[in-house]
Amino acid sequence: GPYGQPINLAIDYLLANTQQSGFISAPRAASHGPMYGHGFSVLFLAECYGMSPRAELREALSRGVKLIVDTQNREGGWRYYPQRADADISVTVCQVMALRAARNAGLHVPKETIDRSIQYVKQCQNADGGFMYQLGGGPSAFARSAAAVVALNSAGLYDTPEIRKALDYLAQCLAKPAASQPYYEYGHYYAVQAMWQAGGEAWARWFPAVRDEMTRSQRDDGSWSASIDADYATAMHAIVLQVPNNVLPIFQR
C-alpha cells in the first residue's frame, strides 16, 4: 500500500531495539514507564504481522509476548518496568491489548495469563463504575476507565454488569474539552474503542460529539496540539477519528 515504506521503517526500528530478553525499548527514548512502550510495540508488530509475515517479525513478537507473560505479577497485572513488582491498571491494559493482538496474529498466549489479568482489571472497578489506578483504593478517572473497558472487551466481555456500569460512568465524560480532562488523547484512544464495541445508542451519542469536538480543535496545518507533543496528539486524534472505518484488526467488531 501507499504507506508500506514508512511502516517497514517503523518495524525495522522496533526490531533493532528488541533486546535478547524480548524487551522492546530504545534507551535514549525510554520514558519513566518503558513497559508502555513495550506493550504498544508488541501491539504494533502484531498488527503488522498479519499483513507482513516476516520471519524476524514473528521472532521478535514471540520474545516480546514471552517477556509480558514472564513479568506478570502476583496480582495479575504489570507496572512500569519488566519485573514482577507492583501493578497498575493503565500499564496492565496496555499489556492485555498487546497479548490480544498477538493471539489474533496466531501466536500462543497462555489462557491463565489472560484470565489473571482480567481478574485484576475487574478488581480495580469502583462502585461508581469507573476504575481506580491500583488495587487498594483510589478515585475513578476517565482515561483509565475507558482503558479498562477495552481490556474487558478483549476477553470477550461485552454485556456484563461491569461493562454496563463502566459505560454509564464514561457517558458522564462525554465530549469534555481537552483542558478539563487529564490524558485527553490517551483516554479517547480507548474510549472510542469501548463505544465502538458497545455500538447502538452508546456509539450514536458518543462519536458525533467527540468527532465534532476534535475537528473543531484541529489546527490550520492539520495537526493537533497537546502538552506532551503535537506528533503524539495528531496521531491519537487520527486513530480516534478513523475507528469507524474498521480497518485495523484490533479495532474491528
Can you annotate each of these PLM segments?
Residues 1-6, 19-66, 70-115, 123-209, ...:
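An alpha-helical repeat/solenoid feature that recognizes helix-turn-helix modules
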